[in-house]
Protein backbone atom coordinates (compact mmCIF):
# COMPACT_ATOMS: atom_id res chain seq x y z
CA UNK A 1 0.00 0.00 0.00
CA UNK A 2 1.50 3.32 -1.11
CA UNK A 3 1.94 6.19 1.32
CA UNK A 4 -0.06 9.35 0.49
CA UNK A 5 1.78 12.33 -0.98
CA UNK A 6 0.50 15.86 -0.34
CA UNK A 7 1.26 19.31 -1.73
CA UNK A 8 0.13 22.88 -0.91
CA UNK A 9 -3.39 23.74 -2.11
CA UNK A 10 -2.10 26.48 -4.41
CA UNK A 11 -5.16 26.54 -6.67
CA UNK A 12 -7.51 27.89 -4.01
CA UNK A 13 -8.59 31.52 -4.34
CA UNK A 14 -9.91 33.53 -1.41
CA UNK A 15 -12.40 36.31 -2.22
CA UNK A 16 -13.76 39.11 -0.03
CA UNK A 17 -17.21 38.23 1.33
CA UNK A 18 -18.96 40.85 -0.80
CA UNK A 19 -17.35 39.45 -3.93
CA UNK A 20 -18.28 35.91 -2.88
CA UNK A 21 -21.91 36.95 -2.55
CA UNK A 22 -21.79 38.72 -5.90
CA UNK A 23 -20.16 35.76 -7.67
CA UNK A 24 -22.60 33.25 -6.18
CA UNK A 25 -25.62 35.36 -7.24
CA UNK A 26 -24.28 35.95 -10.75
CA UNK A 27 -23.63 32.24 -11.16
CA UNK A 28 -27.13 31.42 -9.91
CA UNK A 29 -28.73 33.94 -12.26
CA UNK A 30 -26.90 32.36 -15.20
CA UNK A 31 -27.50 28.71 -14.30
CA UNK A 32 -31.25 29.09 -13.74
CA UNK A 33 -31.56 30.15 -17.40
CA UNK A 34 -30.57 26.63 -18.42
CA UNK A 35 -33.36 24.60 -19.98
CA UNK A 36 -33.44 21.15 -21.51
CA UNK A 37 -33.85 21.55 -25.27
CA UNK A 38 -35.16 19.03 -27.80
CA UNK A 39 -35.06 21.23 -30.90
CA UNK A 40 -31.46 21.62 -32.02
CA UNK A 41 -29.75 23.43 -34.87
CA UNK A 42 -27.23 21.60 -37.04
CA UNK A 43 -24.99 24.67 -36.83
CA UNK A 44 -21.37 23.57 -36.29
CA UNK A 45 -19.74 24.00 -32.88
CA UNK A 46 -15.94 24.26 -32.65
CA UNK A 47 -14.50 21.02 -31.29
CA UNK A 48 -12.30 22.93 -28.83
CA UNK A 49 -15.39 24.11 -26.94
CA UNK A 50 -16.54 20.52 -26.43
CA UNK A 51 -13.03 19.46 -25.42
CA UNK A 52 -12.80 22.22 -22.81
CA UNK A 53 -16.17 21.27 -21.34
CA UNK A 54 -15.23 17.59 -21.13
CA UNK A 55 -11.95 18.52 -19.44
CA UNK A 56 -14.04 20.41 -16.89
CA UNK A 57 -16.10 17.26 -16.29
CA UNK A 58 -12.91 15.23 -16.01
CA UNK A 59 -11.83 17.37 -13.05
CA UNK A 60 -14.79 16.14 -10.98
CA UNK A 61 -14.28 14.42 -7.63
CA UNK A 62 -14.68 10.64 -7.65
CA UNK A 63 -14.57 7.65 -5.34
CA UNK A 64 -10.92 6.94 -4.44
CA UNK A 65 -10.01 9.27 -7.32
CA UNK A 66 -10.57 6.39 -9.76
CA UNK A 67 -12.40 8.67 -12.23
CA UNK A 68 -14.70 5.87 -13.49
CA UNK A 69 -15.99 7.61 -16.61
CA UNK A 70 -15.42 7.70 -20.33
CA UNK A 71 -16.80 10.36 -22.64
CA UNK A 72 -17.38 9.14 -26.20
CA UNK A 73 -18.02 12.08 -28.53
CA UNK A 74 -20.05 11.20 -31.62
CA UNK A 75 -19.87 13.57 -34.60
CA UNK A 76 -20.00 11.10 -37.51
CA UNK A 77 -23.41 11.28 -39.28
CA UNK A 78 -23.56 7.53 -39.92
CA UNK A 79 -22.86 6.68 -36.29
CA UNK A 80 -25.45 9.21 -35.14
CA UNK A 81 -27.96 7.62 -37.51
CA UNK A 82 -27.21 4.17 -36.08
CA UNK A 83 -27.70 5.47 -32.55
CA UNK A 84 -30.97 7.14 -33.48
CA UNK A 85 -32.31 3.99 -35.14
CA UNK A 86 -31.46 1.80 -32.15
CA UNK A 87 -32.73 4.36 -29.63
CA UNK A 88 -36.05 4.81 -31.41
CA UNK A 89 -36.57 1.06 -31.52
CA UNK A 90 -36.17 0.88 -27.75
CA UNK A 91 -38.26 4.00 -27.17
CA UNK A 92 -41.09 2.68 -29.33
CA UNK A 93 -41.29 -0.39 -27.09
CA UNK A 94 -41.06 1.82 -24.01
CA UNK A 95 -43.98 4.02 -24.98
CA UNK A 96 -46.14 1.18 -26.34
CA UNK A 97 -45.40 -1.69 -23.95
CA UNK A 98 -42.77 -1.26 -21.25
CA UNK A 99 -43.57 2.00 -19.48
CA UNK A 100 -46.19 1.88 -16.72
CA UNK A 101 -49.10 4.29 -16.90
CA UNK A 102 -47.65 6.43 -14.09
CA UNK A 103 -44.41 6.97 -16.02
CA UNK A 104 -46.22 7.97 -19.19
CA UNK A 105 -48.36 10.39 -17.21
CA UNK A 106 -45.22 11.92 -15.68
CA UNK A 107 -43.74 12.40 -19.16
CA UNK A 108 -46.89 13.90 -20.68
CA UNK A 109 -46.19 17.56 -19.68
CA UNK A 110 -42.83 17.34 -21.46
CA UNK A 111 -44.37 16.34 -24.80
CA UNK A 112 -41.94 13.48 -25.46
CA UNK A 113 -42.47 10.43 -27.69
CA UNK A 114 -40.42 7.74 -29.44
CA UNK A 115 -39.22 10.08 -32.21
CA UNK A 116 -35.70 11.39 -31.54
CA UNK A 117 -34.57 13.52 -34.53
CA UNK A 118 -32.20 15.48 -32.30
CA UNK A 119 -29.91 12.44 -32.24
CA UNK A 120 -29.02 13.20 -35.86
CA UNK A 121 -29.53 16.97 -36.01
CA UNK A 122 -27.39 18.10 -33.06
CA UNK A 123 -23.68 18.35 -33.94
CA UNK A 124 -22.52 16.35 -30.91
CA UNK A 125 -23.71 13.35 -28.94
CA UNK A 126 -21.58 12.85 -25.84
CA UNK A 127 -22.20 9.28 -24.71
CA UNK A 128 -21.08 8.95 -21.10
CA UNK A 129 -20.00 5.52 -19.91
CA UNK A 130 -19.57 4.39 -16.31
CA UNK A 131 -16.70 1.99 -15.65
CA UNK A 132 -17.36 -0.68 -12.99
CA UNK A 133 -13.66 -1.54 -13.02
CA UNK A 134 -10.53 -0.49 -14.86
CA UNK A 135 -8.31 -2.95 -16.68
CA UNK A 136 -4.56 -2.68 -17.24
CA UNK A 137 -2.72 -3.85 -20.35
CA UNK A 138 -1.78 -7.09 -18.58
CA UNK A 139 -5.46 -7.83 -17.94
CA UNK A 140 -5.45 -7.09 -14.22
CA UNK A 141 -8.63 -5.47 -12.91
CA UNK A 142 -9.09 -2.67 -10.37
CA UNK A 143 -12.54 -2.21 -8.82
CA UNK A 144 -14.05 1.27 -8.95
CA UNK A 145 -16.05 2.73 -6.07
CA UNK A 146 -19.13 4.98 -5.92
CA UNK A 147 -19.34 4.74 -9.69
CA UNK A 148 -22.85 6.15 -10.20
CA UNK A 149 -22.24 8.99 -7.76
CA UNK A 150 -18.92 9.88 -9.39
CA UNK A 151 -20.21 9.76 -12.96
CA UNK A 152 -23.32 11.71 -11.94
CA UNK A 153 -21.21 14.51 -10.48
CA UNK A 154 -19.02 14.63 -13.60
CA UNK A 155 -22.10 14.72 -15.82
CA UNK A 156 -23.59 17.61 -13.86
CA UNK A 157 -20.34 19.53 -14.23
CA UNK A 158 -20.35 18.81 -17.98
CA UNK A 159 -23.91 20.09 -18.39
CA UNK A 160 -23.03 23.25 -16.47
CA UNK A 161 -19.84 23.79 -18.49
CA UNK A 162 -21.72 23.44 -21.79
CA UNK A 163 -24.36 25.91 -20.59
CA UNK A 164 -21.63 28.31 -19.51
CA UNK A 165 -20.14 28.08 -23.00
CA UNK A 166 -23.47 29.02 -24.57
CA UNK A 167 -24.69 25.60 -25.69
CA UNK A 168 -27.96 23.81 -25.06
CA UNK A 169 -28.16 20.24 -23.76
CA UNK A 170 -30.53 17.30 -23.49
CA UNK A 171 -30.01 14.26 -21.28
CA UNK A 172 -31.34 11.22 -23.12
CA UNK A 173 -31.59 7.79 -21.51
CA UNK A 174 -33.17 5.21 -23.82
CA UNK A 175 -33.89 2.02 -21.92
CA UNK A 176 -32.12 -0.32 -22.22
CA UNK A 177 -28.92 1.30 -23.54
CA UNK A 178 -26.83 -1.80 -24.26
CA UNK A 179 -26.77 -0.93 -27.96
CA UNK A 180 -24.49 2.03 -27.24
CA UNK A 181 -21.66 -0.18 -26.04
CA UNK A 182 -22.01 -2.28 -29.20
CA UNK A 183 -22.19 0.64 -31.65
CA UNK A 184 -19.32 2.52 -30.01
CA UNK A 185 -17.12 -0.49 -29.31
CA UNK A 186 -16.78 -0.01 -25.58
CA UNK A 187 -15.54 -2.67 -23.15
CA UNK A 188 -17.53 -5.06 -20.98
CA UNK A 189 -16.46 -3.08 -17.92
CA UNK A 190 -18.49 -0.09 -19.11
CA UNK A 191 -22.21 0.63 -19.10
CA UNK A 192 -23.87 3.55 -20.83
CA UNK A 193 -24.86 6.18 -18.26
CA UNK A 194 -26.63 8.57 -20.63
CA UNK A 195 -26.46 10.37 -23.96
CA UNK A 196 -25.82 14.10 -23.60
CA UNK A 197 -27.02 15.84 -26.74
CA UNK A 198 -25.48 19.27 -27.23
CA UNK A 199 -25.32 22.11 -29.71
CA UNK A 200 -27.09 25.37 -30.44
CA UNK A 201 -30.87 25.38 -30.01
CA UNK A 202 -32.85 25.86 -33.20
CA UNK A 203 -34.35 29.29 -33.79
CA UNK A 204 -37.81 27.72 -33.38
CA UNK A 205 -36.92 25.90 -30.16
CA UNK A 206 -39.62 25.84 -27.51
CA UNK A 207 -39.53 24.50 -23.96
CA UNK A 208 -42.42 23.21 -21.85
CA UNK A 209 -44.05 25.47 -19.30
CA UNK A 210 -43.11 23.71 -16.08
CA UNK A 211 -42.11 24.75 -12.56
CA UNK A 212 -39.18 23.92 -10.33
CA UNK A 213 -39.70 23.15 -6.67
CA UNK A 214 -39.28 26.10 -4.33
CA UNK A 215 -36.05 26.51 -2.36
CA UNK A 216 -37.95 25.73 0.84
CA UNK A 217 -39.23 22.44 -0.58
CA UNK A 218 -35.81 21.00 -1.34
CA UNK A 219 -33.66 22.58 1.38
CA UNK A 220 -33.41 22.06 5.15
CA UNK A 221 -30.96 23.84 7.46
CA UNK A 222 -30.06 22.47 10.90
Outline where the language-model segments fall.
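Short, electropositive alpha-helical surface patch
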Residues: 180-193
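Glycine/small-residue-rich phosphate/adenosyl-binding loop
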Residues: 67, 73-151
Amino acid sequence: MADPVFEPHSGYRQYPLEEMQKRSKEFLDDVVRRRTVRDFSDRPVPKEIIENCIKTAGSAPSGANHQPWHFTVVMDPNTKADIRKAAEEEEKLLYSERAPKEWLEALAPLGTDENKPFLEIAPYLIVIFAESYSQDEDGSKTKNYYVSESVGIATGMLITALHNAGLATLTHTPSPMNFLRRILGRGKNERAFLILVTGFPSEEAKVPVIEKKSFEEYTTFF
